[in-house]
Amino acid sequence: MDVCSKNSNRTAPVSEGGIRRADVPLCSRTNGWSWPPHPFQFLAWLLYLYFAVTGFGVFVPLLPTHWIPAGYICTGITFVCHLFMHLMAVSIDPADYNVRAKSYKGPMPVFDRTKHAHVIENCHCYLCEVDVGPKSKHCSACNKCVASFDHHCRWLNNCVGSRNYWLFLNSVISALLGIVLVVVIASYVFIEFFLDPSKLRSDKHFQQVRNESVVWFVFLPVAPVTTAGPAIPALAGVTIALGLLSALLLGHLLCFHIYLMWNRLSTYEYIVRQRHRQEAGDSRKPPPENDSGVPKLNLIKQQVSYSGTLGYTNPEMEVEDPKAMTSQEGAARYGNGRIRCSSEHMDEEEHLPSVLTEQKASPHPHKHAQKKKRKVRKLAAEVNGDISIDTSTAKGLQKTSAEKESSVAAATVSSSLGQRLPFPAFPLRASLPPLAPVQAAGPPAEYHSDSAESLEEIPVAMARLGSAALAGAQIPTTTATASSSYSSMLQCALPSSAAGHAAPSPQPRTKRKTAARTVSEQRFEMLYHNPSMFMTRESGEPAIPPEESPRAAKRKQTGKKRNTEDAKPSSRVGTSLA
């Protein structure tokens, strides 16, 4: 067995510790009859002889008389076919055509991997020293290139290629059929031996010993040999066990090659593909946990408060860690360990939508209800130049970053599921308003109405809807001029009683509560205000109070209207109803 364990036909370089015998030539094997034989080859021959002897010599002669010819013919054909196919598959040289054309009876060189990475490169074998086909492979067991290499069969002790593949496949099919027939006959003999032994004693030799039922004959009818009765079921049981095991293995091999033919693969290609899949599966497995405490940052999270999908993931994206943000012990950091300075924090708060600012500024629910009733829409705007960078704080944070790096890293690992993105994946579609004052497009068309009862019903020049500017910005000159022109037209159109003072609105006026305005609300608001002007009786000209806010002017105008109403009767008293 030591001869079979050592493969002298090796293609790999000999190790430094190994001793290479100079008198042993490294020759190529021609076919399955070349030395040395494989143990599986001997086992295949022994199994073939066993099933042939037991089938034709013991079980088929014990069959009923009318079944004996069918048993010999069917079983004999399968065994003969298998023997022919097996011998042909073993005897054929499956080498490549150029290898067979060249005499390879001499010793083969040992492959040196320091010169070439592979034995066959660009369809040239550096061991056989010939050009081979694209599907030819150099078999290390046979030490030669095999045309359309499939696999090296140890039962045949020969390579299986394009020249002997169908012979190999037919030998498998014939062996499977022959073993199945032998198992069926042995099972019948085993069962009838216990049920009705007389059906197995139909031969003329059993008629001579009719009274002695314990005597049985084997190898009938040519060379009858007397044996004991229990030997027949014992031999049948062993044959059934070996036959079932052999049929299972041969059936699995046949199904495997049918699968390969269906997918147009060879055994070698299938093994290589499975190896690649196994390596790919091992690479997908998560690596072992790192004990050094380096934080593992997961940039993609499923629970994100914005809508849309990320087209790609930028590995340099800064993601905030909530535990690092809310930590009271250390400085505020990003999830990747970088320190967040105060200026960056303020910029992020300004770039957030105004809805988030309203939620932070108004924690009470009744203030939210008042804002919904007002229906004031606000848009986010960038304000440049009103934020000062605290350099001393940034330097202090950078000094403490090295001391608390390990604690923040551990918190980042434990809170990977709670990370959030401080900005949406896509920018807002609303365009940012310009920082310059908004000018009116032009004076509107002349307004004519006989039902105008107050100045609030007369349109004034306003900015377009959707424009935004800083709160407290001065009204442009063009807007003031347009307002004065409106008042002059009103003075000509309205009667003298209405020009003196403004009539009260028919709708009841409710006093609105002035809620506390936050800094963010004062910073951004729409330019939707009534013009701060009032009418005087003496001059009849519109006057704009200097340096007064819109709300103060409105309160002053409302108070004056009420005083006038108390002093004089309403202008609507003497009006006749139509």
Swiss-Prot record:
InterPro entries: Palmitoyltrfase_DHHC (IPR001594), PFA4/ZDH16/20/ERF2-like (IPR039859). PROSITE patterns: DHHC (PS50216). It catalyses: L-cysteinyl-[protein] + hexadecanoyl-CoA = S-hexadecanoyl-L-cysteinyl-[protein] + CoA. Pfam families: DHHC. The keyword Transmembrane helix applies. Residues 63-71, 196-230 are lumenal. It is a multi-pass membrane protein. The chain crosses the membrane at residues 42-62, 72-92, 175-195, 231-251. GO terms for molecular function: protein-cysteine S-palmitoyltransferase activity. Keywords: Acyltransferase, Endoplasmic reticulum, Endosome, Golgi apparatus, Lipoprotein, Membrane, Palmitate, Transferase, Transmembrane, Transmembrane helix. Residues 121-173 form the DHHC domain. It is found in: Endosome membrane; Endoplasmic reticulum membrane; Golgi apparatus. Residues 363-376, 552-561 have a biased composition (Basic residues). Its EC number is 2.3.1.225. Residues 1-41, 93-174, 252-578 are cytoplasmic. It comes from the Eukaryota. PANTHER family: PALMITOYLTRANSFERASE ZDHHC1, ZINC FINGER DHHC DOMAIN CONTAINING PROTEIN. Palmitoyltransferase that catalyzes the addition of palmitate onto various protein substrates, such as ncdn and nlrp3. This is Palmitoyltransferase ZDHHC1.
